Amino acid sequence: AAAAAGRGRSFSPAAPAPSSVRLPGRQAPAPAAASALAVEADPAADRVSSLSQVSGVLGSQWGDEGKGKLVDVLAPRFDIVARCQGGANAGHTIYNSEGKKFALHLVPSGILHEGTLCVVGNGAVIHVPGFFGEIDGLQSNGVSCDGRILVSDRAHLLFDLHQTVDGLREAELANSFIGTTKRGIGPCYSSKVTRNGLRVCDLRHMDTFGDKLDVLFEDAAARFEGFKYSKGMLKEEVERYKRFAERLEPFIADTVHVLNESIRQKKKILVEGGQATMLDIDFGTYPFVTSSSPSAGGICTGLGIAPRVIGDLIGVVKAYTTRVGSGPFPTELLGEEGDVLRKAGMEFGTTTGRPRRCGWLDIVALKYCCDINGFSSLNLTKLDVLSGLPEIKLGVSYNQMDGEKLQSFPGDLDTLEQVQVNYEVLPGWDSDISSVRSYSELPQAARRYVERIEELAGVPVHYIGVGPGRDALIYK
């Protein structure tokens, strides 16, 4: 086998439902059978219709895997699409039937489908101006949002001051940048944990809103010398949020009740995860992580639904690996090789525009994510980006510096930074596969690559992305 790029070694592969209750702010949804008519001729109908009543789409790398596209494709089969965590730091790029591009951050990707209700759960953090900006952008492009989005009354509010604090905190860390999006996500979750945050339901009590917001301002001013605060700023912000409160009111709902009633009524719910497991506050490469739980556990805590109701979970994984910002990346390709993947895959962040670091698919990290989440299947995305490479590598195991093989993905950052990756080398393929829609029509080398990933991860690949459009998807 050819020598591995970068560090490492290579070797060749050897309960009964109650009476119907209308969802708040939405016309009574058409039964699932009705929506099935539109996709009856779709060869993927059986694969999609077999998904559980409550299913989820979660990232299984460091984000940017292409979750939004799969959610967009699956959404017509579901009554509700729900976000359970994160905020505007999560970027989802989707395309409508005319090929128009939409870059969403907080609004769930199901918004392009008129029969789908979108829910932003209690585990998310809401920057109200940004939320309205997304809605205005959608509506200006002909996408109706009226009565189609519900925001949890328990979700926390993310203020501009959180974004200011985010930048000040990052500057304080000097050479130890976590690489945040500076969208205020971490400071907002910090306010939540220290119990001085404000929630969406506080917008219904403007008589006490100012006093609560004052505590946040004072706290930031006491903590950061660079944070300038005056009572005039507070007054302006309160007046601003009075206007926001009036506009947001039709969107506010007790989403815990809505979702659980919907489950009892046998409605289908698709959970759209933001970020990914390798950025999870508990399971990710801490401290280079996000501030919430983008893994399976975050579904329950971020929506208020029980673990027993969750069925199929689909892990989304790129055919290679990318990462934005700092943090360990064992299979990273530096220099020209990384540039080739970056340019071919147009690897620049949806939210930040930052160039993504690129490398080979890390099977050790993928298996770790599969263990944590219990994925029933995988969606392998951007397989087309690998076309034209003479050979493709899979990082199948890690060795420590002393040569001893690691038995699991290490939690210790120092250990992870020093691992030596063992690679399998597989043959590449020359042909452009972006127009292929049947698994059997893929080049033999591409099929072997997919099947080797299945073997190593122990989870079947049911969906294969071969381009950005919603139709550029192979069902296996």
UniProtKB/Swiss-Prot annotation:
GTP binds at residues 63-69, 91-93, 356, 382-384, 465-467. IMP binds at residues 64-67, 89-92, 181, 195, 275, 290, 354. GO terms for molecular function: adenylosuccinate synthase activity; GTP binding; metal ion binding. Binds 1 Mg(2+) ion per subunit. It catalyses: IMP + L-aspartate + GTP = N(6)-(1,2-dicarboxyethyl)-AMP + GDP + phosphate + 2 H(+). Mg(2+) binds at residues 64, 91. Disulfide bonds: none annotated. GO terms for biological process: 'de novo' AMP biosynthetic process; IMP metabolic process. Its EC number is 6.3.4.4. It is an enzyme of class 6 (ligase). Plays an important role in the de novo pathway and in the salvage pathway of purine nucleotide biosynthesis. Catalyzes the first committed step in the biosynthesis of AMP from IMP. This protein may be expected to contain an N-terminal transit peptide but none has been predicted. Homodimer. This is Adenylosuccinate synthetase, chloroplastic. It comes from Triticum aestivum (Wheat).
